[in-house]
Amino acid sequence: MGTTILVLSKILTFLLTTMLIGSSVIQCSSVTYDKKAIVINGHRRILLSGSIHYPRSTPEMWEDLIKKAKDGGLDVIDTYVFWNGHEPSPGTYNFEGRYDLVRFIKTIQEVGLYVHLRIGPYVCAEWNFGGFPVWLKYVDGISFRTDNGPFKSAMQGFTEKIVQMMKEHRFFASQGGPIILSQIENEFEPDLKGLGPAGHSYVNWAAKMAVGLNTGVPWVMCKEDDAPDPIINTCNGFYCDYFTPNKPYKPTMWTEAWSGWFTEFGGTVPKRPVEDLAFGVARFIQKGGSYINYYMYHGGTNFGRTAGGPFITTSYDYDAPIDEYGLVQEPKYSHLKQLHQAIKQCEAALVSSDPHVTKLGNYEEAHVFTAGKGSCVAFLTNYHMNAPAKVVFNNRHYTLPAWSISILPDCRNVVFNTATVAAKTSHVQMVPSGSILYSVARYDEDIATYGNRGTITARGLLEQVNVTRDTTDYLWYTTSVDIKASESFLRGGKWPTLTVDSAGHAVHVFVNGHFYGSAFGTRENRKFSFSSQVNLRGGANKIALLSVAVGLPNVGPHFETWATGIVGSVVLHGLDEGNKDLSWQKWTYQAGLRGESMNLVSPTEDSSVDWIKGSLAKQNKQPLTWYKAYFDAPRGNEPLALDLKSMGKGQAWINGQSIGRYWMAFAKGDCGSCNYAGTYRQNKCQSGCGEPTQRWYHVPRSWLKPKGNLLVLFEELGGDISKVSVVKRSVN
């Protein structure tokens, strides 16, 4: 009997062991750090990480994205936590769909990677309001990100909520889960100088609060040089080989190695050559760095109204190794994969010693690491931006391309050079899907009735977000002006000029129901002015200004105080009595569009809506027009997009879900040749000059049904829906 039990016990042990080996689920129990590296279960690790933000893709995409990240050589998935997505109103929480944080982390765990959970809860990230819920702005006495009681109370409450949720699911490494790191605050250093002692006090409070949550894993602060112990301060940037942590017993970590850059409407599309990105990573490693996170590894899509900035595009592709649609971008993906393999071959030596640096020439160096049993690793570097170099190292000859590093895991043989790219460049095409739009219909916003429903009236011009609370991009400002019958312009004289000064971001101007034009700011200059001659009549004239937000700011000192909307002046010039300032007269305000209040985007919207159908629906190209059409899901499994080049500016929905803002703003910039060598900045390698910044808009296949998918567009400027199409993204 004893023998039988022993045999059964061995069989059970074998089966359990086999299951664990076959499973890639991460199992941790101890995460600490020392001066060299993050230490997991007693072992120093070189950790390669990539940012994937769960709301910027769909749950159906997550597993494939994470598997591609693992296959690309990553150890860790990094993500922010998006407060405004999770707590849209005080005490009301959302952890469903794209905001299902638990499902996202479980997926990472099941694939077999670690997690760096950057709780913040300020995220920046080109995300609307930097991740803060707009209601937070209206808490009595609040001031963001400083030694302020109301802010600290709200921040602590949300942070505790997330930490407790992670603990309940046993997600922290100390519980056997995948979370090995957490971040409190984010990129605070740029704002610290302006805050003085209150800023330092806030940093110390945030650190103490986070550590007191007893997660059992290290906490970091990125771009915060005075992060107090035991918090690890880390680096963000295009390069971080210059960075040293604030204490000699902390590891050297790079939380954001920028793989590219974001795009803004009206701007070019930045590209970062992979040769330079790999060079930056290898430079960091050879200087003793042990943790690198690519921001972004998959950028994804700013669905809905989540894009910040303002003026950040719906696409958040970021020139990442995995593109917006979930396809690998070559040669970036494979070249970095080969870099990761080379670094991992060197791991034992890299975490065992500091580099010994030897000059090999004016621009050339050798960084040598050694470990036990004669182990030797070398990084041979050529910093020259134009010329290759021939060097001698260990009595052997090597050729180093310009601006490159060769990695020698045995101090003899080169296994990788950052500037020598073997992978072929992806050939990306947007091809017809075969799916056509049918049952096209149109609904025109009724300008004449604005001011008659759901309005407030006040003297003077009100700040936009104070009225809308960011429930909509749109706010109507309407007023009436009386014109004397004796005005000379009514008898053939020059029309008066209307000027409107706005704090951002766009405005469409109507007088007596007639459209007189639009004006826009930019991300760099949100404020702008509109000016146009207008045809007024004797008696009462109605001025209607539709102010449009294009994402709330996500970065800058106390950006919660920045104004949006028409808060400058509104003036009529050229009247017989001179100028007439309308700014302080009675104005009526209406948040949102009629189509929004009627829920025209919903597949179950009221059938009594008077849509214009048939050929007439395609003929009107006036501003403020709703379009709807239907299409069937294209065959195959290629990613899909809407081609909106024929449209102007607005928003788009598929089956009631917003795919984001669109705008055919044409890119201005210098799109000349791009040399990988030399220091990279976001304006160095530009593409897309003379084309719309974003023409195609991602349509997740999981949002579609086989037949009868509803497309709704709200067009602000005037467009041609007959030329809108559904396309497939093809990569060869």
From Swiss-Prot:
Its main location: secreted. Glycans are attached at residue 466. The active site is at 187 (proton donor), 256 (nucleophile). GO terms for biological process: carbohydrate metabolic process. GO terms for molecular function: beta-galactosidase activity. It is found in: Secreted, Extracellular space, Apoplast. It catalyses: Hydrolysis of terminal non-reducing beta-D-galactose residues in beta-D-galactosides. Keywords: Apoplast, Glycoprotein, Glycosidase, Hydrolase, Secreted, Signal. GO terms for cellular component: apoplast; nucleus; plant-type cell wall. InterPro entries: BetaGal_gal-bd, Galactose-bd-like_sf, GHD, Gly_Hdrlase_35_cat, Glyco_hydro_35_CS, Glycoside_Hdrlase_35, Glycoside_hydrolase_SF. Its EC number is 3.2.1.23. Belongs to the glycosyl hydrolase 35 family. This is Beta-galactosidase 5.
